[in-house]
Every structure is written in C-alpha cells, then in structure tokens.
C-alpha cells in the first residue's frame, strides 16, 4: 500500500525555475504560475498520470461504445432495458449505507469553483454545495487551476475573498454545507496537460488533483471519516460507472484509506442511462450515495439520441417540463430505484434568480419554485437543487414542511408502482407546439451563453435564470432538429418553416442582444464568434455530440508555444 506523497521524489531545488516540475511522460502546456505549481506538484501529477495510464484504454473503449450506440439509434433502434442484466434489476440487494454526514440533503446549491461563489454557497444554509468543474465552468486553464486552489482553501477552512468594490471580506461561517465536487464528463479532454503524448482525460485531472490534495483533511473536517464526495455527470451506461468505481478503488488503495470511503451521486441526465440505473448502482454499490435528475441535460440527450427519428420532434423547450409523461416516468423510476437500493433520490434544478427590482415578478418566480419543489417532495425526492443562495430558504421550507425532522424519505416513500413503468413510458413523445418565440429564445440564449463561456464564464444569468451549458445544448440541438426536419412553427399561427426564417431570426436576435447588453459590451465580448459557432452547429449536416467540445478549441492556450514544463 502506497501512501500519497511518498513517491520518493527529492525536494525541489531552491533555484527559481519558471516551469512546472513534472514526472516522466507528463507535459504541462498551460501558463506557469507559482500558485498553480502548489497544485501541480510532482507527486500530484504522478497520481493523475497513474490514473490516466491505468484507465485510458477503458475510457477510449467506452467512448467507442457510445459511437456504436449512436449508430444503432440513428438506424432506428430505441434505447431500452438490457435483458442480459435483468438479474441485477430484479435482485434484492442494496448499496452500502450512506455516511451520516450526508444523511440530510434536503437542499443542495450548485455553482462553479469560483472563490466568492464557494464561500457564499458553503454559507448559504444549504445542506450540500456541489462545486462544479463541469457545466457551470468554462474550462480555461485559469479557471481550472484557480478552482483547485479555491477548493483546497475551502477544505482547509482558510478560504477568504476580498471584494474591493464592495469593501467587504467574505469568509466561512462556523456551520457550512457539505462539499461535493463534480468533475467533467468522460468525453472531455484536458488539452493543457499531456500524458505520454496525448491530452489527459479532463475528469481524471479534476478528480485526481482534488483528491490528492484534500482527501485527508476532508475526511477529518467534513466527511466524519468518509469522503471525499463527488457528483458524476453525463454517463450513459454501467460500463462507464464501472470505470469510475475502479478509479475510486485505486485512489483509496493508493491513499491507504478504507474501500468505500469515496462516495458519489450519479446524475441521470442521458436517455440511455435511465434504463441502466440499477446497473449503475450495482457497479458503484460500495461508493454510491444516490442519483440526481439532471433534467435539462436529459431533454438534450432525448433530442440527441433520437436525432435520426423525425417522429420524435420536441415542442418549445419551455413546454417540456416534469409533467410530460416521459419526464414524470423518469423521475418516478429514479425515486423507486434509489429508495429500493437504500440511497438518496435528488430532484432537479431551480434556476431562478431573485428579481430585486420587480417584487411582482419576483413573487411569481418564487411561486414557480415552490410549486416545483412541492411536486418533487410529494413524489418522494429526498432533496433538490438550487442555483442561487436566495432560493435556499424557500426550497428548505417546502421540504421541511413535508418531511418534518426526517432527514430523507428513503424508508417512507417507495414508489413501488414505478416498477410497472415500461420502455414506452420512458420514451413517450412529448406533447406541445413550436413557436417563433421558442426559436428566438433558443437562438439568443444559446449565443449569449456561448459568448460568456468563451470569455471565461460558465454560469451565466440570462433573463432571470442562472444558465449553464445544458441550456445552450438543448437550445442548439432543438434548432438543429427543427432545421433538419423542416419543422413548421405551428403554435402561433404563423405556419412558417424554421428553415425559411432561421437566418433572419439570427440577425434580429443579434441586434436584440446588442441593444440589451449595450454597444460597448457587445463590441468587447465574443458575441460574433459565438454566433458563428452556434449557427454552424445548428446548421451542420450531422449533429455534434457536444457544443463544448467544439468551443473548447477556442479557449485552449499553450504557454509558451512549445512547452511549459521541465522534463
């Protein structure tokens, strides 16, 4: 058993060298910074490299399996339950008991790994803060490395933020939320770190650096002997969950901590994964603390999965809520599966932002939040997500009024009738209409989000909602689907085809964006670049899997031109 930090490297020379000290085969191409170097230590990089070398072929195979599944769906196949794993779905087994530290997860707040956000979220009164390296973060080198620094300071309890504009210093309260961290998905590379000549896997960098620097402190201060805790995004099947389980076991072994110390909640946010929830649990049964309804990404995945199916066109995305039969079925089956296996079933995001200058609109927004959370807690969810500290009190009141002092509903709400849900229930076509305003909203929100992402912001307030990459993705794929199949806008009496008006809509929405943000900000921002990327993706003959994979090429900066590490 090898304790982390005992790889046997000699102490670095006191001579100042403006390059990262790296183990063999590792090449850092991001900008050198002395603060970053405290994260990118030789031992930490060796740990990441060990993970990359052991699991890269498994990851590549999993990505090839995704391509093969996409080919089948495009040829007319439908996702469904796997007959070969029926014994797992029908078996009477449970995941290991959840740690006492996370028994109560009534309200969780999410946000990027930015310094002020971390402090405000941990102080918000929420039970959990999910610090995000994924959809709420633009993965620039600066954001990723500063995020690791910020989390290390947060785990140690020393994090502060001096807001000079407000003449205020932010620091942690005595009581704070439990910290979960969401690394990137399997598909995203980290192009600033090369291992053996190829880009590292983004999630292994996020997980590896965070785990290496924080596991010991976290277990003492936050986890009550368990942890660290994670959220795992974008998985499509149990094969991908098995890789994560192996990563966790390797990390635990190398750190010399008990098997099952690391715990993770999996986001069910792809359509194929809803048919594999039991199987995902089975692979992660020693490390699982539940599932979460990632509903925006789930709708995005519905379109992506059925990109070759002209009979499964979505209405305006605003009409695809949790009352649609296929969405309610997904939620009910998730709750039933989680509680049957003894773990938490987490509800979806409340993305509203308090509207301070309009009390009437603000109350209407909060009423929407209350209704959504009331639906979730009545359905049996054990907790929910909020994107803004101002929503925590409202969400907490709804869950507490329904649950009392019980920390969760795992034993009290079983949703057994959901065992009768069929593949048809989970795939039922959504109902609704398509409108010009739906097309316009998708266009301007998609472009504005992408413009912010390209300039370093992954969590973006737009029209009183806190948006992340999932919103841009659903906006993009919905327009792509409507264009590909020549959809008619049937909801507002116009009767025009999207293909005939999209070019004009883009021009008019760009003009509207310029009016709304102001000419100076529009000129300095990357709105025109974002518009080119977004419209190219919407009009492409084949649908790209992820908008952020394409856009990532625009934010990768190598310093210096050749190499930034001491080999």
Curated annotation (Swiss-Prot):
Keywords: Glyoxylate bypass, Glyoxysome, Peroxisome, Transferase, Tricarboxylic acid cycle
GO MF annotations, alphabetized: malate synthase activity
EC number: 2.3.3.9
Pathway assignment: Carbohydrate metabolism; glyoxylate cycle; (S)-malate from isocitrate: step 2/2
Catalytic-site annotation from UniProt: 182 (proton acceptor), 468 (proton donor)
Top EC class, one word: transferase
GO annotation, biological process: glyoxylate cycle; tricarboxylic acid cycle
Gene3D superfamilies, alphabetized: Malate synthase, domain 3, Malate synthase, domain III
Reaction it catalyzes: glyoxylate + acetyl-CoA + H2O = (S)-malate + CoA + H(+)
Similarity comment: family membership: Belongs to the malate synthase family.
NCBIfam families the UniProt entry points to: malate_syn_A
Protein name: Malate synthase, glyoxysomal
Organism, scientific name: Gossypium hirsutum (Upland cotton)
